[in-house]
Each structure stands twice: as structure tokens, then as C-alpha cells.
């Protein structure tokens, strides 16, 4: 080993250039990462494939500017040097560096890191007077030469660089190392890879135009690091995340300050950032530092409805009381991602630029500003949705600069809109690769899968001793949970069992299938399709606990006192099960109700044998219901919340067109199953936290901020109810009492308002969170995790592995594999939280898409389906917000139009526009015209007309128009008593199976012809079904207008178990 010194010029935390001298050690033996290695290097982890024609070594500039091209999976045999890696780490942002790390860690990319600066024959010290850029390029070239010689010339090496001097100097130095530009490389080696060529031209053009010609500054410069550091410590500056109000994207954004970063005790709300100038080039989601403006410059949030998302027009006298207002002084971390945009109409482009090469494109997301891109394909991209990426936003530019990536498709087409939703939510779900499918077990008629005898002997066999059954939606194929309940000998104890598909038996940790599942983190359910987390051979077959077949399971078995139902003991472990009955919810409920119904599994039996089996099944269902009621009562005592919601699903005709949107009726058996799943999740959480106190994956639900309950409290007060929000128990009791016997919808709306106040339930590692914060507020449980849906949630896969490790520790056995440390688990938890949020948003957006499709082809003035009953649940300066229970919609209803006319109501309740005025109060709004006055109160029923508001650049939206101040005559009476519906919190537990099985039901009824890809990957491309399942959390997110007056869009959050 050789010791020397290395001189670095780094940026300090205060933004200064610092000269650093570090000890530098070099040695002969450094892993090369190639499968062609001739020197027996100790290569650990990924190695480069031998099935490539060459290896490619990009220099620092290429890695810095053209990383997107290197991320294409078609490019193989990439050797990233330590020189390039560390330079990017020090000179580019964290997001760019994390992308580079992900590229190296992902086994699907044929790319390795070569520590060239530790290899004594590869590293070259910096020469006197040599620029840092030249030194870096020379080091990368030396690494390429060393690599070629190390492999004994078995593989040509191509170094790509944008340094023309380097190309001239090195191109003829070594016959086995070729030094060429990025463009020459793509033309010579990848002439047919159009995606790479498009990216190159777009990025290169943007880089050429980045140099500014001395234009005047539009925005103030960001503050230097040393000023920021001192200001944050003193409390002058506040750090937080910028959230843009999509309804007034040019004017309103809010910063939710993080923790106690500010010492300003007056800050009990978010900080308003008013106008683009004060936003100072920050984009929605950026981590920013802000400075509060003087108090006399504080402004209030807009209290009026805006006509359409992103609508901008003057709104006098419609602001709330002044609130803390600030300006952005620095952007700590960019949240840039891929954006879907639409080019403006051709005539508008001509006015922007004569040559139509520099164009302002409009993002699909209202919260993102217009982006300037350069393209020579402007005419061809008309009416297309395209993806762009941001490159820079200089202080001299009104808009950020970006570059074109690729075309998604024609605007308005179903497939394009679905792909837009996926891109906007950063969801990447390609078909499972051949390598991943090769890891899967085979189960065909010719080669049926069989259980392994050693595996069978190591498990507890419940096949003959337990009556196991599943309760799922009709047609469910991916059954990941089953139940059992029986009276133990002696009659003094019951045994309750929850049996979950043993996914971890088939998905080995670190396998390609496991890595893909980790990347996806969840199964994505859209309105017309799903993207599975696992291949179909597992999710719909070998991991599905179907009736009448032997399956591996992970089980939790409780012994309960037969009278008190208190837990006497609990057992965790791997089992063998055979489900006797595959029931659906309606069938199970009918059996419990004493109705004469047909159980398919009992059809072959006759007489007394059939009666005996039916009696056993009924007894099990009744006992299970009794146990579930007890479990729910126990949680209720602790303060579990019952938050109301509406589920809606679509009915289709034979041509797969939506014919109706139908609310789904809740059943007690739904909650029975959910309570058992919650109980299993809770006990597994206790077990893994006790065994691994510093690195167990749990799920907590933090208590909401009290100010978020203001809307709920004020609305309830207007109707004569008092809501106590000091604890979850107090809130639950208050909501239970807030019942209007004349209108059950009042209670349901109050529960929805409570949902909007809730924070998100999140995964976390126990070593990263104080124990007092483990509590799940909504479920009223001290410990909670997810264990019961490993087919669809990667969090459950992690928990299964932790549980088995805990069981092994109990037996004084070492876990079969090393478990993730706290840091790794916390990073993974954050990844899963982000993906879950993306899945939720994408499902909500796809439902909205299909709701618009349902109403789009209907004449709102003649079709009675476009007229519906609505309930007022919030009052604004120029209208009110209404809920349409028939379709599960929320939206804005305007009482004042652009011309200043207001709604006038005649004697029959019909509405028309007339000159007049509005007066807004906390619980009502009064319209006054020459014909009289009319008052609209909170919780009044009115009649609205639903129509579609088309948009060229954004998603279509639904418009609610008031046509009568009276309830709609066709509205159906509420059949459900207030407070008696399914809990929105337990909804998530059963929602997974419902969504998937509804698709299976549709498929069975129609028996569509599937393409080869659909059969293999079970990821449909054609619109073969529409499933619109809406739970309480999604109803909150569907609110079309509430975000105008909340601090930020994220304040309308979900509450899920």
C-alpha cells in the first residue's frame, strides 16, 4: 500500500471554497467489477456482464450532464469511475447524487463503480498548473486504459467525453481504448436507440443556451450559506416545504415549517408566500428557507372560490384575516421530477418565437410554472402530451429552463391520460423481466407445483385440524388472508387464527423479484387496471389462499377465554393450511342473517352430512362475529375513530362503457374481517418491536394539529353540535352524538370533515422515533404495523421477515439472514411512504378521469343522470362547497359569476342569474336581488347539474351548477343510519382485496381475450374494466375546491390504518 496526499477544492457548508489536503492510500488490489477479470479480483456484489461488445467509461462531464442517458437500461457495460462519482457528489445536488447511487445499486442496470483513485497504477496525481477539469479527465482516461489492460485486451473500452481537447489528445494513444464524444458514441453504437438520441439533442441544446447574455435580474439572488446558517439558528429564517395552492398557483403558496426551526412564538399556522416574486424560483415540494415580511405586509389566504383550477383573476375583499407572510431566500433541496406538459397552440408558439424552437410549455400539474424548452419538433408535438425535465432556473429568467425527454401520446386519449397519471406520480411499472420470471416457481398442467417435503415437516400442519375459510369480494383470485375459529377441548377456551399468504417463502431477500417489489412498494390500482407488485404466478396462484388447495401460510393463533375473550396465549409461525370455504362478503352476511343461501363447497354433499357442515360453518361465522365485536368494543374504549365514507363502483355495458356510478352498501362482515386483520397487525407489531426495539418496521398515526379541526368544530356548531377534539376518544364520542335524525348525511359529512383534519399514517423504523410516538391515533393502538397483505404491500413482506427472525430468536436460533439496520430500514420506510402516497394519488386521479368520462358523453341539460342532490358543507365568499352523495363527489357551486351577477331563487326554487349582492356568514350565505333574498345554510340540500369542464393542457374536471335550492326529487332516502357505516380507518384493511377481486369478477363475466403480455404479466393495457372504489381518505382528496382555503394542498390528507 502506498500513502500519498491528495489536494481537493471543496465547497464548505458556508458556501466558501476550501482547499483540503487529505491522506490518500493506493494499492494494487482493487476490485474491477468485471466478469472478464483475469486477475482474480475480489469482486463483491454486482459485476459487469460478459455478454456485451464493449465497456463504456463516461468522464465527469458526461456523468454530470447526461446522466439520464446512462440511466437507460439498454446501455450496458458502464464503468463509473470514483473520480466522476465523487465530483458529482461535491458539485451537484443531492437529488442528482442519489440518482447516481441508485443506478449503481440497482442490479437491473449493468453498471459498476471502479475505485480508480485507490488503484496505484490507475491514479495519477495532479500536475502543477493543471486545471481541475483536465486532471479529472486525465484520471478517467487512465482508468479506461488500466481497465483495458487489466482484462488483457479481452474487451474494448470506450471513453466518452465532451472535452474536444481530450478527444484530440487521447484518441490515438491506445488501440484498445477509444475516446469519442457522447453523440459519436450514440451514433456509432446505438443508432436505433431513439430515446437516447432525443435526450442527447434536448440536453445538448439546453446546455448551449444556458449561458445568459447579461439580461436583467427578475428575482433576487439566494442568500449565501453562512448567512442562512446564522439566520436559522437565531430564528430569523424558517425552513420548510413549499406547497402551492393549485387553485391559485400564481399567487398562493404556503410553507409548512419543520419542527421548531423557528423561534417565533407567533407562528401557529403555515406561512403564506404571496406571488411568484416572493416564491423566488422555488417549485412545489422544494425544501426552502424563508424570511417573514414585516407585519404590515402580511396578507390573508383567499376565501373565494376560483372558477377552475389554476384560474387567476382579481378577488377583492375575499381574504381571511392576515396571516404570517414571507419570502423565499434560499432553496435547500430541489424537488424536480419528470413533468408532463402540453405545447401551446401553434399560433401562440409563433408569437413566442419566430423559429418555434424556444417554447413555453404548460405542465399538466397546475402547481408547476410554465417551462421553457428548446425543440425543433414543435409542429409534430402539437396536441401531444410530452415529458420534460427541469435543468435550471436563473435569477434572470421568469420561467425555468428544461429539456424534452419523450412523447407520451395524443392528449385526451385514454392510454395517454393513464400514462400521464403514472408519470406525474413518479410510478414506473414495466412488465416483469424474463430474469425475474425465471425466479418464479412453475405451476402448469404439465408441470404442477408441489410442496417440498422438508418444508412441510418444518411447519405446523393445520390442514386437518382447523376449519379455515376466507371472506372476500365476489370472484377474488388473490386471497392473501384466511381465518379460523374453534372451541378448544374442555370448552373453556377459543382459538382465533389469522392465516396470511407466505410470500417470503417464494420471494427471497435480495432476488430480482424482491428488488422489483421493493422498488414498486405496492400494487397500484387504477380505475381500469392494476399493476401488480408481484408476478401473477404468486399473486393469483401459489400465494393465493384459494379454497381446497394446500398452501404455505404465516399464522397468528390466539387462545382466548371463551367467556371474557381475553387473550390467554398467542403463537406465531409458519403453517400449512387448506381453506375449506371461499366465501364472499354478501354470502357470509346472508348466512349470518339466517337466510337460505347456497354455499358452493356444500353442493356435492347431501342430507345430514351437508347439514352438519353448514352448522359448523355457521357456528364459526357467529363466533367470529362475536369476537370481532369484542375487539371493536375494546378499541372503542381506547378512542378508536369511526369516520364515515362512501364507496362508488362503476357498472359497465357489454362494450365496456360506464353506464352508472353506484354507491356500495356496507355490511357488518366487512368490519368483522377488518377487526381480525387489525388484531393480527397489532400483535405482530408488539412481537417484532419487543424482539427488535431499534429496527422494527411499525406504522404510526400522529395526532392531528388542533387548528385543523376548526372547520369541523365551526360546522358542527352551526348545526347545534359540540365537537371535543382534545383526544381521539373525545372526538369519537362527539361524532357519535352529532346525529340529526332527520338527515343522516349530516353525521357523515362531519365525519368526512374529521378525516380532512387527520395526518397521514406512516411507516417508520423504531430506532428513528421516540417510543411515545409509536401510537396509532386513529386505531387507538399503542403498536401497529402491516402484516396481512404481503401480496400487495412490500411493508408486509419486511414485517414477515422480521416476525420469522423474532420467532427464530425465541428458539435461540440466529436469524437466517442479517436484518436491515435502523438507518436502512428508515430509508426504506420513507420510500414505501412515498410510493403509498403516489398510489393513493394516482388512484384518485384515475377515478376522477373516469368520472369525467362517464359524464363527458352526456348532455347535462337533457340527461337526468347529470342532475343530482347535493349537500352544502362549507361556505365561501362567492359560493359554497357541496357533496353529491349519489356519486361521491365534492365540488364548488358558484353564487356569483364573472359579470358580478348572483343567483336569484324564484318561488319554485329554480335559480337564475341576476344583478345583486352576496353576504357571507360563518354558517350561511345570503343572495340579494331585485326579486328578494335567499339564504343558503350549511347542510341544506340543493339540486345541482353536473357537467365536464374540458382542458387542453390539464386534466378535465367536473363542474357543479346550482339549478334549484330544493333537494333533488329523485334523491333516494338514506338507508344507512348515522354512524353505522364501515370505519374509514378499517377500510384500508379490506380495500386491497376488494379492488383486485372486482376486476376478477368483471373478467370472469366477460372472459376477454388476453394478449400474450396480459397473460404473462397480468398488467392490462386495454380498458377492460372500470373499478371505482372510493374510501374515506380518497373522498377527502377528491375535494375539488377545499384546497383554496387550506394552508396547503397536503392539509387535505388521508387517514388510513
UniProtKB/Swiss-Prot annotation:
Subunit note: Component of the RNA exosome complex.
GO biological process, one term: mRNA catabolic process
Cited SUPFAM superfamilies: Nucleic acid-binding proteins
Residue ranges constituting the CSD2 domain according to the UniProt record: 359-425
Family of this protein: Belongs to the RNR ribonuclease family.
CDD domains linked to this entry: PIN_Rrp44-like
Name this protein carries in UniProt: DIS3-like exonuclease 1
Record has DNA damage as a keyword: no
Function: Catalytic component of the RNA exosome complex which has 3'->5' exoribonuclease activity and participates in a multitude of cellular RNA processing and degradation events.
Organism: Danio rerio
Gene3D superfamilies: 2.40.50.690, 2.40.50.700, 5'-nuclease, Nucleic acid-binding proteins
Keyword set, alphabetical order: Cytoplasm, Exonuclease, Exosome, Hydrolase, Magnesium, Nuclease, RNA-binding
Segments forming domain CSD1: 230-301
RNB domain span: 459-807
Main location: cytoplasm
Chain intervals for the UniProt region annotation (Disordered): 998-1017
Chemical reaction(s) catalysed: Exonucleolytic cleavage in the 3'- to 5'-direction to yield nucleoside 5'-phosphates
EC numbers, comma separated: 3.1.13.1
Record's subcellular location: Cytoplasm
Cofactor(s) the protein requires to work: Mg(2+)
GO molecular function, one term: RNA binding
Root EC class: hydrolase
Sequence ranges of Basic and acidic residues compositional bias: 1001-1017
GO cellular component: cytoplasmic exosome (RNase complex)
Amino acid at each position: 500500500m502506498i500513502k500519498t496526499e491528495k489536494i481537493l477544492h471543496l465547497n464548505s457548508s458556508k458556501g466558501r471554497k476550501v482547499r483540503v489536503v487529505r491522506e490518500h492510500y493506493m494499492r494494487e488490489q482493487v476490485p474491477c467489477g468485471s466478469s472478464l477479470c483475469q486477475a482474480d479480483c475480489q469482486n463483491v456484489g454486482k459485476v459487469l456482464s460478459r455478454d456485451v461488445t464493449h465497456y463504456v467509461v463516461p468522464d465527469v462531464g458526461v456523468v454530470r450532464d447526461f446522466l439520464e442517458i446512462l440511466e437507460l437500461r439498454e446501455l450496458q457495460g458502464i464503468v463509473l469511475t470514483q473520480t466522476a462519482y465523487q465530483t458529482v457528489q461535491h458539485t451537484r445536488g443531492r437529488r442528482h447524487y442519489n440518482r447516481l447511487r441508485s443506478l449503481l445499486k440497482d442490479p437491473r442496470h449493468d453498471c459498476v463503480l471502479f475505485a480508480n483513485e485507490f488503484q496505484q497504477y490507475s491514479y495519477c496525481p495532479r500536475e502543477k498548473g493543471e486545471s481541475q477539469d483536465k486532471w479529472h479527465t486525465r484520471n478517467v482516461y487512465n482508468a479506461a486504459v488500466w481497465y483495458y489492460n487489466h482484462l488483457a485486451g479481452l474487451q474494448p473500452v470506450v471513453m466518452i467525453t465532451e472535452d474536444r481537447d481530450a478527444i484530440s489528445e487521447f484518441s490515438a494513444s491506445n488501440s484498445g481504448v477509444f475516446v469519442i464524444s457522447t453523440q459519436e458514441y450514440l451514433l456509432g453504437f446505438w443508432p436505433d436507440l431513439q430515446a437516447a438520441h432525443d435526450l442527447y439533442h434536448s440536453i445538448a441544446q439546453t446546455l448551449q443556451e444556458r449561458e445568459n447574455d447579461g439580461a436583467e435580474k427578475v428575482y433576487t439572488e439566494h442568500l449565501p450559506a453562512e448567512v442562512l446558517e446564522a439566520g436559522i439558528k437565531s430564528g430569523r429564517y424558517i425552513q420548510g416545504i413549499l406547497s402551492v395552492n393549485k387553485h391559485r398557483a400564481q399567487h398562493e403558496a404556503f410553507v409548512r415549517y419543520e419542527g421548531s426551526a423557528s423561534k417565533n412564538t407567533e407562528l401557529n399556522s403555515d406561512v403564506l408566500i404571496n406571488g411568484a416574486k416572493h416564491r423566488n424560483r422555488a417549485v412545489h415540494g422544494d425544501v426552502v428557507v424563508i424570511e417573514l415580511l414585516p407585519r404590515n405586509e402580511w396578507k390573508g389566504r383567499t376565501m373565494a372560490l376560483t372558477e377552475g383550477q389554476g384560474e387567476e383573476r382579481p378577488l377583492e375583499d375575499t381574504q381571511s384575516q392576515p396571516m404570517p407572510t414571507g419570502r423565499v431566500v434560499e432553496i435547500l433541496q430541489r424537488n424536480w421530477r419528470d413533468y408532463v406538459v402540453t405545447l401551446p397552440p401553434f399560433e401562440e408558439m409563433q408569437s413566442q418565437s419566430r423559429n418555434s424552437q424556444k417554447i413555453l410549455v404548460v405542465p399538466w400539474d397546475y402547481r408547476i410554472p410554465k417551462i421553457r424548452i428548446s425543440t425543433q419538433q414543435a409542429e409534430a408535438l402539437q396536441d401531444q402530451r410530452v415529458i420534460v425535465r427541469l435543468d435550471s432556473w436563473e435569477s434572470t429568467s421568469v420561467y425555468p429552463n428544461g429539456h424534452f425527454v419523450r412523447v407520451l401520446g395524443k392528449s385526451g386519449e385514454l392510454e395517454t391520460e393513464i400514462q400521464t397519471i403514472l408519470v406525474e406520480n413518479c410510478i414506473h411499472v414495466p412488465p416483469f423481466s424474463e430474469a425475474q420470471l425465471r425466479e418464479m416457481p412453475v405451476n402448469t398442467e404439465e408441470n404442477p407445483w408441489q410442496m417440498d417435503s422438508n418444508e412441510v415437516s418444518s411447519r405446523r400442519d393445520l390442514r386437518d385440524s382447523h376449519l379455515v375459510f376466507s371472506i372476500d369480494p365476489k370472484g377474488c383470485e388473490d386471497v392473501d388472508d384466511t381465518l379460523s375459529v374453534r372451541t378448544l377441548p374442555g370448552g373453556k377456551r377459543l382459538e382465533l387464527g389469522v392465516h396470511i399468504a407466505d410470500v417470503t417463502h417464494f420471494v427471497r431477500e435480495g432476488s430480482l423479484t424482491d428488488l422489483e417489489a421493493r422498488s414498486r412498494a405496492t400494487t397500484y390500482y387504477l380505475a381500469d387496471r392494476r399493476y401488480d407488485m408481484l408476478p401473477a404466478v404468486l399473486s393469483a396462484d401459489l400465494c393465493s389462499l384459494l379454497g381446497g388447495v394446500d398452501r404455505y401460510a404465516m399464522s397468528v393463533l390466539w387462545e382466548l377465554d371463551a367467556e371474557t375473550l381475553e387473550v390467554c396465549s398467542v403463537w406465531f409461525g409458519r403453517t400449512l393450511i387448506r381453506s375449506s370455504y371461499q366465501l364472499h362478503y354478501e354470502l357470509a352476511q346472508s348466512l349470518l342473517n339466517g337466510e337460505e343461501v347456497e354455499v358452493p363447497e356444500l353442493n356435492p354433499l347431501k342430507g345430514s352430512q351437508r347439514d352438519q357442515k353448514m352448522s359448523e360453518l355457521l357456528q364459526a361465522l357467529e363466533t367470529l362475529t362475536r369476537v370481532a365485536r369484542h375487539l371493536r368494543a375494546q378499541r372503542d374504549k381506547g378512542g378508536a375513530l369511526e369516520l364515515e365514507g362512501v364507496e362508488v363502483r362503476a357498472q359497465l355495458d357489454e362494450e365496456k362503457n360506464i353506464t352508472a356510478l353506484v354507491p356500495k352498501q356496507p355490511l357488518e362482515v366487512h368490519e368483522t374481517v377488518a377487526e381480525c386483520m387489525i388484531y393480527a397487525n397489532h400483535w405482530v407489531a408488539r412481537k417484532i418491536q419487543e424482539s427488535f426495539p431499534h429496527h422494527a418496521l411499525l406504522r404510526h398515526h400522529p395526532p392531528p394539529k388542533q387548528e385543523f379541526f376548526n372547520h369541523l368544530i365551526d360546522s358542527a356548531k352551526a348545526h347545534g353540535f359540540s365537537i371535543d377534539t382534545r383526544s381521539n376518544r373525545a372526538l369519537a364520542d362527539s361524532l357519535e352524538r352529532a346525529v340529526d335524525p332527520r338527515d343522516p348525511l349530516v353525521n357523515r359529512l362531519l365525519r368526512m370533515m374529521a378525516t380532512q383534519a387527520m395526518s397521514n399514517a406512516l411507516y417508520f423504523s423504531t430506532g428513528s422515533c421516540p417510543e411515545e410516538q409509536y401510537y396509532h391515533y386513529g386505531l387507538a393502538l399503542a403498536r401497529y404495523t402491516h402484516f396481512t397483505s404481503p401480496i400487495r404491500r412490500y411493508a408486509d413482506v419486511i414485517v414477515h421477515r422480521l416476525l420469522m427472525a423474532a420467532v427464530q430468536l425465541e428458539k435461540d436460533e440466529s436469524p437466517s439472514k442479517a436484518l436491515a439496520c435502523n438507518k436502512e430500514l428508515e430509508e426504506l420506510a420513507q420510500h414505501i411512504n412515498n410510493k403509498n402516497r403516489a398510489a393513493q394519488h394516482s388512484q384518485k386521479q384515475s377515478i376522477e378521469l373516469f368520472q369525467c368520462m362517464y359524464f363527458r358523453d352526456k348532455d347535462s341539460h337533457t340527461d337526468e343522470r347529470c342532475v343530482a342532490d347535493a349537500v352544502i358543507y362549507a361556505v365561501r365568499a362567492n359560493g359554497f362547497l357541496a357533496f353529491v352523495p349519489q356519486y361521491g363527489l365534492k365540488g364548488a357551486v358558484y353564487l356569483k359569476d364573472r359579470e358580478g351577477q348572483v343567483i336569484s331563487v324564484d318561488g319554485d326554487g329554480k335559480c337564475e342569474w341576476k344583478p345583486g349582492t352576496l353576504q357571507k356568514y360563518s354558517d350561511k350565505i345570503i343572495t340579494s336581488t331585485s326579486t328578494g333574498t335567499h339564504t343558503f345554510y350549511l347542510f341544506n340540500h340543493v339540486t345541482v347539474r353536473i357537467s365536464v369542464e374540458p382542458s387542453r393542457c390539464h386534466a378535465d374536471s367536473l363542474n357543479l351548477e346550482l339549478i334549484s335550492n330544493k333537494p333533488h326529487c329523485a334523491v333516494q332516502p338514506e338507508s344507512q343510519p348515522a354512524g353505522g357505516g364501515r370505519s374509514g380507518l378499517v377500510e384500508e384493511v379490506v380495500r386491497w382485496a376488494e379492488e383486485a377481486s372486482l376486476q376478477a369478477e368483471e373478467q370472469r363475466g366477460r372472459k376477454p381475450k388476453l394478449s400474450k403480455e396480459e397473460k404473462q404479466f397480468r398488467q392490462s393495457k386495454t380498458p377492460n374494466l372500470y373499478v371505482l372504489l372510493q374510501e374515506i381518505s380518497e373522498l377527502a382528496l377528491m375535494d375539488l375546491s377545499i384546497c383554496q382555503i387550506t394552508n396547503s394542498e397536503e392539509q387535505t390528507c388521508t387517514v388510513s390504518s
